[in-house]
């Protein structure tokens, strides 16, 4: 938490290793924490597991709590940010991928419905 700048947008990843590759990021490590910062300044980044009911439900819950949410493109073959790094992509490329796939509100719910496979 000491490396977070709460005056900037915050990225919240599912896994601690994933958070190491992003600017101003922390990890929930599978927990459903009640974050004490403005949810609208946070972007939740879950693993790319469209068949995982728990992840889909947590994504919907994050949108209901006014978090921004990354919904990975269907063409992405990797499970998480760490896998994307291993594939040879840079942190900057991942930041762009995240920016291009961040949604909120009804738009996020629509993207979740198109992404999920359950």
Task: Write out the residue ranges for each language-model feature.
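Charged, flexible boundary elements
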Residues: 1-2
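TOPRIM fold recognition
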Residues: 6-10, 16-118
């Amino acid at each position: 938490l000491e490396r977070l700048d709460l005056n900037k947008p915050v990225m919240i990843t599912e896994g601690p290793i994933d958070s190491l590759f992003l600017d101003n990021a922390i990890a929930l490590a599978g927990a459903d924490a009640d974050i004490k910062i403005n949810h609208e300044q946070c972007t939740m980044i879950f693993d790319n597991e469209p068949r995982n009911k728990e992840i889909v439900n947590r994504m919907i819950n994050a949108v209901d709590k006014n978090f921004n949410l990354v919904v990975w493109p269907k063409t992405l073959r990797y499970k998480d940010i760490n896998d994307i790094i291993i594939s040879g992509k840079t942190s900057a490329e991942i930041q762009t991928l995240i920016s291009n796939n961040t949604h909120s509100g009804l738009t996020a719910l629509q993207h979740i419905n198109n992404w999920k496979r359950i």
